[in-house]
Amino acid sequence: MNKETVVVLDFGGQYNQLIARRVRELSVYSEMLPYDTSYEEIVAKKPQAIILTGSPASVHGGEAPGCDPRVFSLGIPVLGICYGMQLMAEQMGGKVQPSSLREYGRAVLQLTGKDEIFKGLPDEMQVWMSHGDTIISLPEGFRITASTANCPVAAISCPQRRLYGVQFHPEVRHSTYGMDIIRNFLFEICGLRGDWDLSDFISEAIEEIKNKVGKKRVLCALSGGVDSSVAATLVHQAVGEQLVCVFVDNGLLRKGEASQVIDTFAKEMKMNLVFVDARERFLAKLAGITEPERKRKIIGEEFIRIFEEEKAKLGEIDYLVQGTIYPDIVESGTSTAQTIKSHHNVGGLPEDMDFQLIEPLRLLFKDEVRLVGEKLGIPAEILWRQPFPGPGLGVRVLEEVSFEKLEILREADAIVRDEIKKAGLEREIWQAFAVLPPVRSVGVMGDARTYAYPIIIRAVISEDAMTAEVARLPWELLDIMARRIVNEVAGVNRVAYDITSKPPGTIEWE
């Protein structure tokens, strides 16, 4: 299929996948490529435009990532964002240096000249900044089009060559007119139509899976969560009875989750489902382990070992399906992005794994996964389940995991989710869950001294898990949760509410 394509060159910045997502929201297909992708490979993609992303690096650093400068001479529009703008300026003859006035967070942008990229926008607007360098000398043919109080060169352009740069991050929602800026770039400057939607993704993914798998059999790691459910359904549409779904109860699931998965997929959706009770096995492997990364890798490796064992029972199976999505890949790090945490769907897999992977959702964000699921006819009660980490409660029981701690957390978590549902907030809250820290505190219950665990409630609002704001739950709701937890869950005498956004925190504690 010939479709409009925007290539996003990834330099490792925190928000880079959001850029690709914003472009897709405007019905234009975007594809992320590593910053060092060859000029020939970029040309082979036949892009209508190129976007250069942000980066944690500095353009004047010794190992600054760069792209082939010939991309600026392709004759197609290029938009540089943050580091991308500085790189464009540096590679085309300008100069960048560290700034004495760094900018992190909200800033007020003032337009200093007319430009197509700001068409129809006010002269003053809020933007989101994250930079420590600044352009001090422009390349020939460029002009300054916007500034802030601390950044005299906040946007540049060379309209004759259709080269544009912004120092801020239009892809982040905190930039009030960010989507309008991206829209202007795509439609006013690039002249695109917007000819891509998720129906195209589904048909292409199904065709790709068919071609890859052929007549071979496929094993799906089914958790019952949104991602694995959509991945399983997509693969099932591609290969039908060649797919075998394996559901592993690792003892790290939420209350009632195992029975719900069996009822939904085996009984209602009629999928070929193999159930494995591995609760004791996982707990034995996790005994004495306190470091989060080790827990994640142990859980990921044990999952694979179980699937390999099931493969041996089932006969010849060559492929393993996983519900890996874009944020999993981002947080696991790229060559230029720092690793925040490894995901068992990505960095936690053993090197000697006896499968080839199929990850049909690896280019999608959570909201896109749900839209695909709707198009595939998956029930809403599955699609709107809150995200649940692959390692499950194993990374919500902080430090060492034990049966006792898991039971405490399972009950507390069920109360949190129950009250969110009763309050009608299920679709407003991205995630709401309980965390069990490895400390105990003194309390008093029934005139007696207690020494028990606290429970931390975590609730956030997000669109894509890349950034998240703390959910401002009603005080009355928090009070109900706290009273229920301390009264109904043995071993708990205190409840706290986590009010940290992402960044600086991650959504999960481990």
From Swiss-Prot:
User: Can the keyword Methyltransferase be found in this entry's annotation?
Assistant: no
**EC top class, as a word:** ligase
GMPS ATP-PPase domain boundaries? 196-385
Q: EC no.? A: 6.3.5.2
Q: Entry's InterPro entries?
A: Class_I_gatase-like, GATASE, GMP_synth_C, GMP_synth_GATase, GMP_synthase, GMPS_ATP_PPase_dom, NAD/GMP_synthase, Rossmann-like_a/b/a_fold
Which domain of life does this protein belong to? Bacteria
**Which pathway is it part of?**
Purine metabolism; GMP biosynthesis; GMP from XMP (L-Gln route): step 1/1
Please give the subunit comment from the record.
Homodimer.
Query: This protein is called what?
Result: GMP synthase [glutamine-hydrolyzing]
